[in-house]
Amino acid sequence: MGKELEKEKTVIIDDPMTPVPLNQRQHWTAPAFIFGGLEFSVTLLMIGSTLIGAFGLKGIIPVVLFTFICLTWVGNAISGYMGAKTGLSSSVIAKQGFGDKQAKFIIALVIGVISMGWWAVQTSVTGNAFCAVLGIDYTVNRTAWMITTIVAGIVFAIPSVIGYSSMKWTDYFAVPGGILLCIVGIYLALKNIGWSNIISYKGSGEISFAAGVTMILGMNVSQFVISADYTRYAKPCWKDNILRPIGIVAIGIPLLFIGAIMGAGNGTADIVAVMENLGFPIWGFIVLWLAAWTSQLVNNYTMGLSFSNMLNIKTNKGRAIVTAVGTFLSLLLCFTGILENLQKLLSLAALLYPAIAGVMFVDFFLRKGVWEDKQGWNFMATIAMIVGIAVGYITTYIVVIGIPPAQSLIITGITYYVIMKVKAKVAPDKFTEGIN
């Protein structure tokens, strides 16, 4: 009987709407490893290749360190604590500040669609890599590329359809494979280009410091919202949540520099083209697929959770079905040429995620970390989010100033705090309950 009870306790609850019980919470290193897998993405290598073209190798050092240590670490720690404290996924936590209707049909949709976009981008890159292995010119033979992309996508999706427990074990062997890829990439770059040429490489100066930070943050800012999807399996203490982003920083910083070193002098951000130019062996492209697998799991799993919340799916079986259907739709996105629109996807994420995070952060701490499912639609959250998105858009495209994602998050948070405080005094309702 004792063994049966112990076995029952170790079974992971993966229902999208159910808080993870405290007796099933894990050591902080488990979600940290998953975060490392999330950060270990082909997209980050591509961003590194882009940044060295603008800044040179020495010039990207302050950009990378500031983004990861001052912004990414802090945002992830806060978001992670929210998930650990409540045991809930991000799209469910959002119900308190936004109201269940808004969280279902706007927040879950935004998170789900952008996660689909990221998944489609990296699956497209992997299709390119498989074509390189098979000696197929993926720029000409699109039928063969589509077939290889479908195969890669199906394999990518299987662990995320199964659930959290299989994702953890996949990362345990996929991350080392990605590290091997990077080591070989550095070796070939040094062999073909030479360290002196890499270190002295001069960037074009076409991208400002703030724009470089925004580019990196555009990829990572989604974590300010979705971290809770994985930290809900962790213990709810601040120490663990401060340590947990180590997985992101320890992988992200080196990976960006590796992408930069590999891309020096190549004149392209297409990582497959860069690898071909460097003379990567065939197995390197297979390892590229393995490295991409880690972040693909997170993108697909988050997409499934978000759409499950939107459709009010409450079982693990239902979540798995939703994730599988979402995978099919994501494959269709691959064939629309989303890889050529990577910068647009980064910009969209940089506009939407900070505004969502701003409301969620402030609402959570206004209520002192006590979560309650709020029915309806909180228009104060809508107003704050619109203000934040507007600030992000204006400072990105019209009056280019500062770091738009950070500004959007801060302005959204301040706006939400002020109008909720005023509403609590002037016209209190269920959304102002618990706000003093």
Q: Where do the language-model regions lie?
A:
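Membrane-interface loop-to-helix entry segments
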Residues: 147-188, 203-204, 244-247, 346-357, ...
